């Protein structure tokens, strides 16, 4: 067999690097889906970030958010635990020099990526790990960052930082560093996907849809919501996916209002089931699509169910149809299909949003929620948007949730 997998990663059974399983690869090949080249995808991401740093005249960006670390290094380490225990960090200079702070300073989980030039220890400054010495530990880390900037001849010390503990921010500022908003830098950088990222997303979506196909087989009266949701989890992991961000699956009258979490409710005959995948799948790519299914043996759905579903479908279809490069966000907010007044109270939190490694910038609000100046941006090819709709009346019995993930191309 080949020593290289179809995505260019090592075909070595005992490798450390995570990734898609053979089941996923086989399904992609059968479906005729192009598989990404991970080396090219990683290089695109780093080069795009370098460009954005230089556009802002920044010396570099320091990130703690595990998804921003993933974007820069394509490495993982206990992603969910890390999301609330920030023991990792990553610095990239405006020339592309990458330093990763990881557990014990080990390159165990990053040696596969030659773009990571150094691995260091001790970026922690949170209470669980550092206790009442976190302030002094933050000062040590800040000195290290200053030394890095001096060593890179970064005389201006203009550093972007995304999400840092309060002692860390104070320590960096005490060293005379000029701190800028790293979250803005990373969100805007991540908003444009390269060719290989788009291939990776298509693969992730296909794997999610295969999981949904298996999930639908288990959608039977007498099953609990958790029974059904567990199938999506299982099928995601089987294919090399990573986790699910939310618990947005509900049945029957629990579909109204939306945002009730998946639980032990037993699904009855002739009910609807609505869910939002919010799934972090293969390659760490987010697949964020929503569907509402009918469960039971009745031939015809009720007139009310048809009314709700039709409106949700038309919201998705018509709002998607207006998307094209060159539009500004405000045009999307006030364009497309108007939401009927009777559904306004329970409207979803947005009409659309970006997506990549998770739900991402930009957010497209409903006109009633619009805040002038909050999301000033022009749509560009390579952006991916999720178009959403929740249709349900206040005090109503049921609601319908639909959502599609769409790529903006040169033509639409």
Regions from the language model: what does each represent?
Residues 1-412:
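Active-site neighborhoods and metal-handling regions in enzymes and metal-associated proteins
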């Amino acid at each position: 067999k080949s020593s290289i997998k179809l995505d260019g990663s090592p075909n070595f059974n005992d490798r450390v690097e995570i990734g898609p399983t053979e089941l996923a690869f086989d399904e992609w090949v059968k479906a005729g889906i192009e598989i990404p080249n991970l080396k090219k995808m990683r290089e695109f991401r780093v080069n795009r970030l370098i460009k954005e740093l230089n556009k802002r005249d920044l010396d570099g960006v320091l990130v703690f958010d595990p998804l921003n670390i993933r974007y820069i290094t394509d490495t993982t380490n206990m992603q969910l635990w890390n999301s609330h225990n920030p023991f990792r960090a990553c610095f990239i200079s405006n020339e592309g020099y990458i330093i990763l702070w990881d557990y014990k300073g080990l390159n165990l989980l990053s040696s596969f990526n030659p773009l990571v030039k150094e691995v260091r220890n001790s970026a922690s400054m949170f209470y669980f790990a550092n206790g009442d010495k976190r302030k002094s530990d933050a000062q040590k880390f800040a000195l290290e960052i200053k030394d890095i900037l001096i060593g890179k001849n970064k005389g201006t010390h203009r550093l972007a930082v995304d999400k840092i503990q309060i002692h860390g921010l104070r320590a960096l500022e005490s060293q005379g560093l000029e701190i800028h908003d790293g979250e803005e830098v990373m969100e805007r950088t991540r908003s444009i996907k390269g060719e290989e990222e788009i291939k990776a997303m298509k693969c992730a979506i296909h794997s999610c849809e295969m999981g949904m196909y298996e999930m639908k087989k288990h959608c039977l009266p007498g099953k609990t919501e958790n029974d059904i949701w567990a199938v999506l989890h299982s099928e995601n992991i089987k294919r090399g996916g990573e986790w699910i961000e939310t618990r947005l699956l509900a049945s029957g009258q629990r579909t109204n209002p939306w945002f009730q979490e998946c639980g032990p409710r037993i699904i009855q005959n002739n009910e609807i089931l609505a869910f939002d995948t919010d799934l972090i799948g293969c390659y760490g790519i987010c697949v964020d699509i929503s569907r509402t299914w009918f469960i039971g043996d009745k031939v015809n759905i009720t007139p009310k169910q048809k009314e709700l579903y039709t409106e949700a479908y038309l919201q998705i279809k018509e709002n998607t149809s207006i998307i094209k490069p060159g539009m500004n966000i405000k045009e999307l907010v006030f364009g497309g299909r108007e939401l009927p007044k009777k559904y306004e109270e329970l409207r979803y939190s947005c009409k659309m949003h970006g997506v990549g490694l998770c739900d991402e910038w930009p957010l497209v609000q409903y006109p009633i929620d619009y805040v002038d100046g909050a999301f000033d941006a022009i749509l560009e090819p390579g952006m991916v948007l999720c178009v959403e709709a929740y249709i349900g009346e206040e005090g109503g019995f049921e609601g319908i949730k639909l959502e599609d993930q769409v790529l903006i191309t040169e033509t639409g």
